[in-house]
């Protein structure tokens, strides 16, 4: 596996007036997964002062569709989530904790890996047993579930919900933006209908624009019926008029970040 580091002082190339990537990033190329039987790329975005205090540990946010998160040059349609800018802005304003962000690149199996399928189960196992294990061993993380979140949009939002729901002992926070809750004939809702155990200790961020309006509202209502409390267990947001793309998710990224990691 090759590792490429991009430090703050080397990242001043601009893309249409804005800096491509802000902060310290380590790119991990072609990490072999025994579980998936393929090589995967991911990046680890580190807090600005990560190297200044060797004793400090940080919460971690795992995100899907890694190529779309911090660099418009690698992102779909040339627009990224601006995760690096938003986290930096909020931490500099002392509104949220410093965190580590791990962005897992997708591949041709994205649809199946992000769903409740055999490949989806393998992807979840890869995240926990291989990727998270590697990140926790190499970086100064707060590895417990209370300091570990997962987030994505569209199918990545569905994946985040499923991963946290099935593994609350690992992920206690799930950011589900414009999620594809409709996928596979509303299977995720059938799963919730069949659940009769005590409420799982997970914080959910649920949002949508005009896309997914009915399913997003349905998920919020269903979780509320199951005992999840708005403002404590759930943050719900309807972005009126918003389309289904990276630019829109970038505009409201501060909401889940503050809900999960706000001071």
Give short role names for the model-derived ranges.
Residues 2-263:
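Non-catalytic cap/lid and distal C-terminal segments of serine-dependent acyl enzymes
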């Amino acid at each position: 596996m090759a590792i490429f580091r991009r430090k703050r002082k080397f990242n001043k190339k601009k893309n249409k007036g804005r800096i491509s990537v802000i902060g310290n990033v380590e790119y991990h190329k072609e990490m072999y997964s025994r579980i998936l039987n393929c090589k995967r790329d991911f990046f680890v975005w580190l807090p600005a002062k990560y190297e200044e205090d060797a004793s400090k540990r940080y919460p971690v946010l795992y995100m899907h569709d890694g190529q779309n998160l911090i660099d418009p040059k690698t992102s779909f349609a040339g627009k990224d989530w601006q995760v690096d800018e938003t986290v930096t802005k909020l931490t500099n304003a002392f509104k949220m904790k410093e965190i580590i962000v791990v962005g897992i690149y997708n591949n041709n199996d994205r649809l199946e890996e992000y769903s409740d399928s055999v490949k989806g189960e393998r992807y979840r196992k890869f995240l926990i047993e291989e990727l998270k294990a590697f990140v926790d061993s190499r970086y100064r993380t707060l590895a417990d579930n209370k300091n570990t979140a997962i987030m994505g949009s569209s199918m990545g939002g569905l994946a985040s919900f499923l991963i946290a729901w099935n593994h609350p002992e690992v992920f206690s926070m799930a950011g589900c933006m414009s999620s594809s809750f409709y996928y596979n004939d509303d299977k995720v809702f059938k799963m919730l209908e069949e659940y009769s155990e005590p409420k799982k200790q997970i914080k959910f961020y649920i949002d949508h624009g005009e896309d997914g309006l009915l399913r997003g509202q349905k998920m919020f209502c269903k979780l509320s019926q199951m005992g999840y409390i708005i403002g404590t267990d759930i943050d719900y947001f309807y972005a009126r008029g918003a389309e289904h793309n990276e630019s829109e998710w970038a505009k409201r990224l501060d909401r889940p970040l503050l809900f999960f990691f706000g001071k």
